[in-house]
Amino acid sequence: MRLRKLMCTAMSAAIVASMAGCGQGKPAETTAAPAAAETTKAEETKAEETKAEETKAEETKAAETKAAEVSSDRSNMFDVIETEGRAIDYGNVDLTPTAEELEAMKKEPAYGKPVRYWMSDGCTSGPNVANLLGYYEEAGLTAEGVKGTSYTEALGTGAAEVAVGHIATMLVPSTNGVDLTFVGGAHIGCKSLYVLADSEYKTTEDLKGTRISTPNGIGASDYNITSLLLDADGINPQKDVELTPVETSACVTAMENGEISAALLSDTFAYKLVQDGKLRCVRSLLDADFQGEPCCIIAMNATFVKENPVISRKIVGAVQKAHSWMRENPDEATQMLIDEGLNSEDFDMNVKLNNSLQFGLSTDFTEAGLRAIAEDYILSLIHI
C-alpha cells in the first residue's frame, strides 16, 4: 500500500482525534443574556484548559514510568519475542509464473529486462539474498545488483527497482514527491539509543538538556528514529535535547569527552561495546512498545510498480521468500551473509542479532505499523 494513502489516513485520524478532543458538541439551547453566556463560555474554556493540563501531566507521568520500566534491564533485549500475526511464511511459496501470469508479464514494459536491486548489507540484504538463492530466477526474472550513495535516490530516479531500507529514511521523501512506494515489510528493531555504561544517564528522561548524536545527519533515519524514541517518552526532540550529527566511529570518544550524552547506533555496532562494559542501552526499537512496528521495509520505484504490476508482485515475492528463509534458517543465513561480506565475521553475534529482527513481516502487521509510524511522526511535528 502506498505510504501517501497511509499518511493521509493517519493525518485524517489525527485531525479527527484532535477535533474530538477540542470539540464541545452541539451547544445547549439557552435564553441567557450575552454577558451571562460569555461568562459561561469563559468558565467552560478554563475548565477545559485545566482538564487538558491534568491530562498532559498524567501522560507525562505515564511516559516517564514507561521509560523507566523499559530502560531498567536489557539483558535479554535480543531474545526473540513471538508476536501472533507478525511473520509471514513464504518459504513454500512457488514463485514460478502461471501461464496467465506469464502472458501478463510479457505485456509489461519491463519484461525481459533485468530487475535492478539495491545491493546492501546486514539487515537490509534481503534483495541480495533473493538473488543468491535464485528466487528472482524462480519468478521468471533476471536480476542485477546496483550500488550508490542513496537507495532513496536510486528508487526515486528509477536507477533501482527495489530496495530494503529504513522507514525512517524514506518516510518524508515518499510524501514529498520522491517516486517510491512501500510494498512489504522486512523486519523489526536494529537501532538503539546508547550511553556510556558508567554514565549517570539511566533513562531518556535523564537526557533532557543534553546533546545526542544522530550519526547520519539531521533529517535522516537516525534523527527520525531518535525523535520517535524520545517523543514516545514525552520528551520533545526539538526543545528538550539537542540532536547533532557525530560520525558513528567517533561517538564513544565524543561521549567520553563530554561532547554528547548519547548516540543512536546500530545494535550490530554497539553489541561488542555493550558486552565489554563500555556502552549501555537506554531505549531501543526492540523495546516492547516498538516491537509492533517494522523498522525496515521493502520499497520500489512507484512508476515501475504502476506500469509493471505483475512483475512487481513477483519481485516482492522473491524478497519476501528470502526474508522467510533468513528467519527460518538463521545459522545458514548468517553464514551466507558473512561469506558474501554482508555481515561482520562474528558469527554468534550476528545469529543472535539477526534472530531478534524477525525477518519476513506480514502485510497486516506492516500496514498497521506504517499507520502507527506515520501518526507518530506527524504528532512529533505537532509537538514542536
Identify the residue ranges that each predicted region occupies:
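Short, glycine-/small- and polar/acidic-enriched structural segments
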Residues: 33, 70-245, 261-267, 278-285, ...
